[in-house]
């Protein structure tokens, strides 16, 4: 019985700590932040936006890539030819009035061949304020609802090493 408790305890601790270690920084252009319900009346102005981020070490040509609403409205923006995102840069895209629904929206980034490169989790934004769904750190896999930071960093993830000096 004691062995069973020890095994279950180890599994519990591993399960709790695993998500913290399982999060990774992407090696491709990502959807870094989305505001599906910005302050104001979405039907009166083009105000919904998507921020892309390039965590790689190379320029990426986004010509013909698509940013798509995949739920109710199914509206797709095609990124213009000649659009380049440099390493570490952010690009903001607006499309048209009411691009997204405010509840249960999933946004996809597709390359010029239609291959899905990145997706958001299902997001809900009923606040009509200055908050957005964003990665907790630029390019990181966790998402949070926080004060919008369009075109700028959500924060950089810093890894620490436990190695001892020689």
What are these regions (language model features)?
Residues 4-9, 18-166:
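Intrinsically disordered, low-complexity linkers and terminal tails enriched in Ser/Thr/Pro/Gly
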């Amino acid at each position: 019985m004691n062995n069973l408790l020890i095994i279950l305890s180890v599994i519990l601790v591993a399960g709790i700590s695993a998500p913290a270690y399982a999060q990774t920084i992407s090696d491709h252009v990502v959807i870094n932040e989305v505001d599906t319900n910005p302050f104001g009346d979405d039907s009166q102005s083009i105000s919904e936006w998507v921020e892309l981020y390039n965590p790689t070490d190379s320029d990426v040509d986004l010509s013909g890539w698509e940013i798509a609403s995949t739920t109710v409205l199914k509206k797709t923006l095609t990124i213009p030819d000649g659009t380049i995102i440099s390493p570490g840069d952010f690009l903001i895209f607006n499309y048209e009035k009411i691009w997204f629904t405010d509840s249960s929206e999933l946004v996809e980034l597709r390359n010029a061949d239609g291959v899905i490169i990145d997706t958001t989790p299902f997001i809900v934004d009923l606040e009509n304020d200055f908050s957005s769904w964003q990665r907790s750190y630029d390019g990181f896999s966790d998402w949070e609802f926080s004060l919008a930071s369009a075109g700028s960093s959500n924060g950089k993830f810093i890894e620490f090493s436990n190695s001892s000096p020689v």
